[in-house]
């Protein structure tokens, strides 16, 4: 978020025209005492990479942060739960136009949109899911549903699975659902 807010800082950290040591020093000065050692290690690694643009740097950091949360969920054997909850949240938002507008409204503060989401789902989902859903509200480039879909794609990669969305005219019975899963697993 700091790199998104502080465009000059982001440009300086991603500027491949300057020495990697200078970029490293900048990262140390700004972040050393404010982030976890793992986060600091990731930020240090960014200073040695070549970035097409400052936005490419922030997108990469965002993806790595999402991966870290999802890896933690996988290690705790909660990845399927988190992915399922994210999918249902996305469907909930997609299915209600007023909610879609409220969560995506650029005239509302990010904090307000996150509070709305927390009020709706906070006590119904895992901590990891809530963290990711609140993070998905931050994006100004994509809709909430698009961001969550990206998170679901990362979750599927981590689980070494493919995703399939099946739409039916009526609710499936347990037997039909089992048969569908069997067919999709082929």
What are these regions (language model features)?
Residues 1-186:
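Elongated, mostly alpha-helical coiled-coil "stalk/stator" tethers of large membrane protein machines
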């Amino acid at each position: 978020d700091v790199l998104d807010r502080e465009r000059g800082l982001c440009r300086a950290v991603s500027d491949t025209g300057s020495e990697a040591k200078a970029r490293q020093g900048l990262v140390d000065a700004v972040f050393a005492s404010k982030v976890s050692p793992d986060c600091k290690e990731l930020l240090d690694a960014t200073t040695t990479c070549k970035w097409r643009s400052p936005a490419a740097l922030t997108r990469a950091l965002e993806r790595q942060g999402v991966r870290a949360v999802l890896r933690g969920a996988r290690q705790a054997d909660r990845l399927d739960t988190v992915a399922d909850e994210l999918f249902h949240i996305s469907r909930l938002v997609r299915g209600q136009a007023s909610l879609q507008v409220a969560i995506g409204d650029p005239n509302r503060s990010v904090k307000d949109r996150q509070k709305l989401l927390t009020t709706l789902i906070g006590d119904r989902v895992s901590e990891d899911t809530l963290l990711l859903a609140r993070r998905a509200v931050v994006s100004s480039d994509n809709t909430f549903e698009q961001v969550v879909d990206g998170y679901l794609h990362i979750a599927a990669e981590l689980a070494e699975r493919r995703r399939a969305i099946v739409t039916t005219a009526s609710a499936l019975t347990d037997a039909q659902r089992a048969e569908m899963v069997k067919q999709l697993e082929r």
